[in-house]
Amino acid sequence: MMRPGMMQRRAAEAAGWGAALALALIAVAVVASTSSWLLYRDGDSVVVALMADSLRRGDSQDWALSPVLFLPETTVYAALSFLGLGTTGTLTLNAVVNLLAVYGGIRLVAGRSRPGSRPVTGSVLAFAAFVALVLLEGPDGMPGFHLALLTATTTYYSATVVGTLVTVGLFRRLLDGAPAVRVVPVMVGVVAISTLTNPLFVVWCVGPVAVTVGILLLGRRIVPRLAFVTLLAVAGAAAVGYLLRGFFAANIVAAGGNYLRPDQAGAALARLAGVLGDTVVSVNGLLWLAVVLALFATSVVVAVRSWRRRDGVVAAVCVLAVVAPLAATALVVVAGTDADRYLQPWVFLPVVVLAAAPPVRSVPRALSVILAGVLALAAVAAVPGTVAAASRPDADLACVTRWIDASGRTGAGQFWTVRAPKLALTDPSHLVQVDNTMRPYDWLVNRAERRGPVTFLIQDAATVPFAGVSTFDATPVRCGRYTILDFGSRVLPLGDPRN
């Protein structure tokens, strides 16, 4: 017979996951309604769906990828796609799964239930703060930072976010005294896979963990043996993961010079200042920044307080929550990049202070019941909106795919224009991804696709005028935001591929 204490803990865990599901549904409903292009149509966002569909069809595989390999993301999407929800339905469900995985990572960081502790309450509170940041960021396309809502996509590092949280949680378990023989193998696996699929994980997690262990060791808050085991596990696993990337060397076409431009550090700083300025011009943006900075400051305060109380476990979590965002910012500046998405640790790590060190006072039972009821009602109300957003027909896209399928011919278009049509086509090889000089653009695309004679072009507002292509004999076919330029029997020559 199950003991009352065990039943109570399981009920609390179930309630926590229920609250997390409700919050995730609310967040996805808002993202699907206000940022549907980012979720379903964006040129980068559809790569995981393209890869999973290609694998399911049994196509030959020769993908040209960025440094990110999308291995966990593709696995999750492919598994969810077997539910038969269609592309937008699967992407929507994937967004919910991503957010629930974030809650799971936060719950791991919160630690085990112990007398006097409320890890479930703290985890729900931390996840609610993360969801609040998603809601405050507003529609994609508005000026300012959009970091939290990226976790809802299959492309923008959701696996790296979750991998970082899980690694921090496992580190906390080691500090809590969990048997290393059980924790370390899992940690090694997570770190190796996370580094293999995205080397950014080293900056977000491996480096900050190493710095935190060093601080704990200098302050005598960790025994040397545990410090050595932790460093060996994360550093060794990261090295293994990075070496395994050698098997994908032919697929990683990104040049290092595109990502490391220290001579552009000044420009990167100026751009960060500009995006920060764009963020605070709206009330939502101002509130978003206030929440982010408040959580970061709270992490600093709790880290200092825990250090003085010789609570090395909570201090370690809070130090990590401070070091990782600073490391991410340093990377953006030193690399001279304009990729704001590298700054995501600012939105998913400082929130864990609410889980690692939840408020001392408990919420009155009556208020808890009221909050649970409101949350449940909001989640139920969010479902129809989410379903409507996921099933909303795209007449323009349907027009393009019908025309291409009926023609049986091959056309071409630029990256931001053809990605969504390629995903919607029965045979994506009927659209060749090119640049404005008609050279095949091998970026986040399967190079094994056949490239038949090109006899039409697709254009939209994002298309850069094609150089050297005369359109005087082309018949325009209007499909809303798209225009098909049909050249009939005239074949447009393609140049040498580039990436």
Language-model regions: role of each:
Residues 155-160, 203-204, 284-291, 315-321, ...:
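Hydrophobic/aromatic-rich transmembrane helices and adjacent perimembrane loops
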Residues 182-199, 203, 207:
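Membrane-interface alpha helices of multi-pass inner-membrane proteins
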Residues 47-53, 63-86, 264-276:
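Short hydrophobic/aromatic helix or loop-helix immediately within or flanking a transmembrane segment
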Residues 178-181, 217-229, 295-323, 334:
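Membrane-interface helix-loop-helix junctions at transmembrane boundaries of multi-pass membrane enzymes
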Residues 21-24, 93-124, 166:
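Transmembrane-helix motifs of polytopic, lipid-linked glycan transferases
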Residues 16, 20, 235, 308-312, ...:
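Signature aromatic-anchored transmembrane alpha helix within multi-pass, membrane-resident enzymes
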Residues 116-172, 338-350, 415-416:
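Membrane-interface micro-motifs in multi-pass membrane enzymes
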Residues 391, 405-443, 456:
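Short periplasmic/luminal acceptor-recognition loop of GT-C membrane glycosyltransferases, typified by
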